[in-house]
């Protein structure tokens, strides 16, 4: 792996640190590498949760590397599997990703955070989509995901002016799960990751699948889809060894031993 990504495995949790000069910005090469990492995470049955953060204390990720852009890298460059940063278009990822925001998450950095399942941020975190001021648009998910998280007036202001949102505002609007001090950030992210990793992995995969497949449906339509047999993980949960193990472990007052099947 390149010097831009530092990977650590802690039990069933994969930790990814983005470490690039000039604000942890991402060029096409780094994006390809991140896509490879997230696909390996997806396909490795020993891994259940990933945490992604940025190196240093100021920047989570400043988004697309504008130096690379100035040198000729096009906005519609091939950013590899999973889209920009390897995650923004990785729609078949059945495992949760936690973004630990250690500072500025601007442009594609905010889009990367929005593609994660949960966000823990330090109290100095800041979020923005300044693309319109650069003559481009946040087309790596920002213009698509932000309207699903915030009221239209707030979305329009952030998209059209590049207005920054601080950590407390992100918490208030539900963008962030929690805000902690910078020194507590990784401990808080790891605590959350461990809690998720203690859940049955097949059930977690089914939850992601159901949420993704039914979020735009009515409750009635969602029920019909769940019972239609077209989902991949939900039917497997119903007839899994883990579905037997959970109640048995509860009755025997012991920790369950998940098999993922």
UniProtKB/Swiss-Prot annotation:
Active site: 111 (nucleophile), 131 (proton acceptor)
Catalytic activity from the UniProt record: (R)-carnitinyl-CoA = crotonobetainyl-CoA + H2O
SUPFAM superfamilies recorded: ClpP/crotonase
Domain of life where this protein originates: Bacteria
EC number: 4.2.1.149
Enzyme class label: lyase
GO biological process: carnitine metabolic process; fatty acid beta-oxidation
Pathway entry: Amine and polyamine metabolism; carnitine metabolism
UniProt keyword list: Lyase
GO terms assigned for molecular function: hydro-lyase activity; L-carnitine CoA-transferase activity
Disulfide bonds: none
A UniProt-annotated Pfam family: ECH_1
Recorded family membership: Belongs to the enoyl-CoA hydratase/isomerase family.
Quaternary organization: Homotrimer.
Function of the molecule: Catalyzes the reversible dehydration of L-carnitinyl-CoA to crotonobetainyl-CoA.
Protein name: Carnitinyl-CoA dehydratase
Organism for this UniProt entry: Proteus sp. (strain LE138)
């Amino acid at each position: 792996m390149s010097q831009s990504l530092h990977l650590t495995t802690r039990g069933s949790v994969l930790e990814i640190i983005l470490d690039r000069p000039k604000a942890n910005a991402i060029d096409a090469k780094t994006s390809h590498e991140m896509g490879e990492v997230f696909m390996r995470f997806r396909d490795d049955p020993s891994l259940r949760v990933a945490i992604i953060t940025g190196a240093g204390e100021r920047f989570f990720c400043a988004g697309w590397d504008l130096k690379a852009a100035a040198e000729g890298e096009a906005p519609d460059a091939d950013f590899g599997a999973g889209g920009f940063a390897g995650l923004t278009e990785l729609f078949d990822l059945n495992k949760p990703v936690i973004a630990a925001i250690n500072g500025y998450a601007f442009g594609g950095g905010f889009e990367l955070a929005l593609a994660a399942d949960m966000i823990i941020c330090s109290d100095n975190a800041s979020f923005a989509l300044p693309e319109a001021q650069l003559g481009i648009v946040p087309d790596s998910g920002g213009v698509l995901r932000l309207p699903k998280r915030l009221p239209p007036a707030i979305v329009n202001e952030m998209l059209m002016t590049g207005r920054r949102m601080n950590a407390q505002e992100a918490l208030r609007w539900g963008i962030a799960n929690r805000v902690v001090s910078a020194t507590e950030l990784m401990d808080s992210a790891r605590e959350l990751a461990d809690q998720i990793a203690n859940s049955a992995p097949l059930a977690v995969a089914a939850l992601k699948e159901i949420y993704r497949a039914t979020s735009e449906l009515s409750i009635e339509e969602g029920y019909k889809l769940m019972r239609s047999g077209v989902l991949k993980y939900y039917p497997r949960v119903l007839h899994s060894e883990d579905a037997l193990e959970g109640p048995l472990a509860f009755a025997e007052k012991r920790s369950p031993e998940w098999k993922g099947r």
